[in-house]
């Protein structure tokens, strides 16, 4: 049976399993009606994902739904926000009901995990793409931003950057990894990144600045440097790598992917000396490693990379959709 737009929405996307109290009216009308809790600031982010640009055209729909939501959740994590609502505008080349069922099941699994509600969106026909709008709350005056770093702050990253780029290389047959367990781990880091929501919430009163690593450490830390009007000195020997990555690529390739590979969706943040002890306590029990890789400074401009105590020049750049090849 043919599935039209409204029956498609009703069948696959209008299936609220638990309504949030702050949603007065969700899917099914011209607008959603929403209530912002008292003494909370609304945090909003929007991402567009296009087949062949942001994801491989043959990606499993369950992985696509997970990643599409996870990368938006990562934006909320970088602000220290609590997830709340999602809008989804989905463009499909045709109606494949098996594809839609897999996509929507995965999407709602992750929505329910974070106690979120899909509140609206749109569907249309065309090349596969989607735009997600995510909304969350952060207590007034406690949001993390890119512009708060100060000279003397210590620079940290969560997790092990570079894994996602390696996973993509495996999927594109640019990297051969014979160990199935390592290959699966690296591919999963690309297809199903872990938004660091709990870490972002814990950093609200500890970090001066934060950003999620979507385009690579060079690019994303560069945003903090620019917004905060100070420099950053990074010791390359301190960058953390996963065992799975280190076992299968030479150190220089691991370094390149960690700095410029992108799509890790870890957090990079800066913490004043006074808060380092509290940071160890706050993040230490969350099960995700976090590593100090350098320090913000007033005596240099931009990013300075150190190897064996000496400055080194790197010509790598983070991902840029409009960069000239």
UniProtKB/Swiss-Prot annotation:
Record-listed ATP binding positions: 121-122, 146, 214
Note: Reaction mechanism of ThiL seems to utilize a direct, inline transfer of the gamma-phosphate of ATP to TMP rather than a phosphorylated enzyme intermediate.
Residues holding Mg(2+) 1: 46-47, 122
InterPro entries documented for this protein: PurM-like_C_dom (IPR010918), PurM-like_C_sf (IPR036676), PurM-like_N (IPR016188), PurM-like_N_sf (IPR036921), ThiL-like (IPR006283)
Residues that, per the record, bind Mg(2+) 3: 30, 75, 212
Chain positions recorded as Mg(2+) 2 binding sites: 47, 75
Keywords: ATP-binding, Kinase, Magnesium, Metal-binding, Nucleotide-binding, Thiamine biosynthesis, Transferase
MF terms in GO: ATP binding; magnesium ion binding; thiamine-phosphate kinase activity
Designated name of the protein: Thiamine-monophosphate kinase
GO annotation, biological process: thiamine biosynthetic process; thiamine diphosphate biosynthetic process
PANTHER family, per the entry: THIAMINE-MONOPHOSPHATE KINASE (PTHR30270:SF0)
């Amino acid at each position: 049976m043919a599935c039209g737009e409204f029956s498609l929405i009703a069948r696959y996307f209008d299936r609220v399993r638990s309504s949030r109290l702050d949603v007065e009216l969700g899917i099914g009308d011209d607008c959603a009606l929403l209530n912002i809790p008292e003494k909370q600031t609304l945090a909003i982010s929007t991402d567009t994902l296009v087949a062949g640009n942001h994801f491989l055209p043959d990606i499993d729909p369950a992985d696509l739904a997970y990643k599409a939501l996870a990368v938006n959740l990562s934006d909320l994590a970088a602000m220290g926000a609590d997830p709340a609502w999602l809008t989804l505008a989905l463009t499909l080349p045709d109606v494949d009901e098996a594809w839609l069922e897999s996509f929507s099941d995965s999407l709602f699994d992750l929505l329910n995990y974070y106690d979120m509600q899909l509140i609206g969106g749109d569907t249309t026909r065309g090349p596969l793409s989607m735009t997600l709008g995510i909304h969350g709350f952060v207590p007034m005056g406690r949001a993390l931003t890119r512009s708060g770093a100060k000279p003397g702050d210590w620079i940290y990253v969560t997790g092990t950057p570079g894994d996602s780029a390696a996973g993509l290389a495996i999927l594109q047959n640019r990297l051969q990894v014979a160990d199935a367990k390592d290959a699966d781990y690296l591919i999963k880091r690309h297809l199903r990144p872990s938004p660091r929501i709990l870490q972002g919430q814990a950093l609200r009163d500890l970090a001066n600045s934060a950003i999620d690593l979507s385009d690579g450490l060079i690019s994303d830390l560069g945003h903090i440097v620019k917004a905060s009007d100070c420099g950053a000195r990074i010791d390359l020997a301190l960058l953390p790598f996963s065992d799975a990555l280190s076992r299968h690529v030479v150190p220089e390739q691991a370094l390149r992917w960690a700095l410029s590979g992108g799509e890790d969706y870890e957090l990079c943040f800066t913490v004043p000396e006074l808060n380092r002890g509290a940071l160890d306590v706050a993040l230490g029990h969350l099960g995700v490693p976090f590593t100090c890789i350098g320090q913000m400074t007033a005596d240099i401009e931009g990013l300075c990379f150190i190897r064996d105590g000496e400055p080194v020049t790197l010509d790598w750049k983070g991902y840029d959709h409009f960069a000239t090849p």
